[in-house]
Swiss-Prot record:
Coiled coil: none
Pfam families per UniProt: Ribosomal_L36 (PF00444)
SUPFAM superfamilies in alphabetical order: Ribosomal protein L36 (SSF57840)
Keyword Ribonucleoprotein: yes
Gene: rpmJ2
KW Ribonucleoprotein (keyword) present: yes
Organism per entry: Kocuria rhizophila (strain ATCC 9341 / DSM 348 / NBRC 103217 / DC2201)
Record's protein name: Large ribosomal subunit protein bL36B
Recorded superkingdom: Bacteria
Keywords, sorted A to Z: Ribonucleoprotein, Ribosomal protein
Amino acid sequence: MKVRTSLRSLKQIPGSQVVRRRGKTYVINKKNPRMKARQG
């Protein structure tokens, strides 16, 4: 999982969804499981 300051480019990728867990914002992708990132 990468830690990025901006998730805007990652949420454009097909199959990705933005999830908020414990006050942090994550991008997860079921189609491409390598595409994971946390904002911070």
